[in-house]
Amino acid sequence: MAPVPYDRCMRRTIFAEEHDLFRQSVRTFIEREVAPNFERWDHDGIVDRTLFTAAGGAGFLGIEAPEQFGGGGVKDFRYNTIINEEFAYSGFAPSGLGITLHNDVCLPYFLSLTTEDQKQRWLPGICSGELITAIAMTEPGIGSDLASMSTSAIRDGDDYVVNGAKTFITNGINADLVIVAVKTDPKERHKGMSLIVIERGTPGFERGRNLEKVGLHAQDTAELFFTDARVPAANLLGSEGTGFAHLVDNLPQERLSIGVSAVAAARQALRWTLEYTHDRTAFGQPIANFQNSRFVLAEIATEVEIAEVFLDRCIEALNANELTVEEAAMAKWWTTELQKRVVDSCVQLHGGYGYMLEYPIARAYIDARIQTIYGGTTEIMKEIIGRSLRP
């Protein structure tokens, strides 16, 4: 009996029929809106803003937002997962990163911390794609130690006066609304942090260059500068001094989102490599026939299956509001380190062609490297887990 073509070994049980239909819609959207433009975006270092409005029109933005604001009114991270996975499977993941950040990372702040007036001002545009979002935490010289940030927001009448700089900001060029972590009390560390939304066009708010990265070329990543930028006090998210706590509350979903992209990218790398190794011949036979190739592919397939099962359990836990900070950290570090190992092994099996950017595995290789850094480094993830372990 001939072997069955590989897709996955275990049947996934977390999705229902409506999710499968949604997945097909996302796949069609990517084929129509992304595929014809990706090479240009990859060259330019930024996607067109129309990608967001097209996604909004298709119902792929603000899925969790109330219908009255143009959202889907559905709190179900499985839909977010599908968008994330399909961009990874397509090979166009960098063009989808801004959308997953918009949905998975930024939207929760606008849902849980906003007043009714803020919701009316911002949510319709966020759901339609007319208002693109970003979140700015990292500062030059300050990476994982957020409490040491120096960007300040000092109250002055009905405004905050913001001074400082942020760097490595995803959607930094395209963003209309930037959630900025600031110190409203510079004398305090964690308790001095607050979150404030700074809008495009605010006097004193300037964007630096679109940073040239090793990978994720189609995703704009920028420096942001604030020089006596006057921001209405009405743009404060939540209350003063609660910013760090809100960041901690929302980081598990961000880290799970990164884990989803990591496992999907690893699975797609395996698919590309299976196709290549069965087509490419050496010494009179497909290179997939060699024992070393079989062993490497077997290891990859096994680890991807294991990772996906754990990830699916984390998705179920998130939907049930049960996902812990430690579980999210486990998912984030393990899956992203797996992605790095997988794409490296897959490049090796491609040989010299794996180093050519015309092959998708080469792009997957350079895109993977950042995954163990942003959203919390592997080392920080292990520290979070390690601190929680008690006899």
State each model region's role:
Residues 74-75, 145-147, 171-175, 189-192, ...:
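Short glycine/proline-enriched turns and hinge-like loops at secondary-structure junctions
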Residues 129-137, 181:
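A short, Trp-centered hydrophobic/proline-enriched beta-strand micro-motif
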Residues 224-249:
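A short, charged helix-loop
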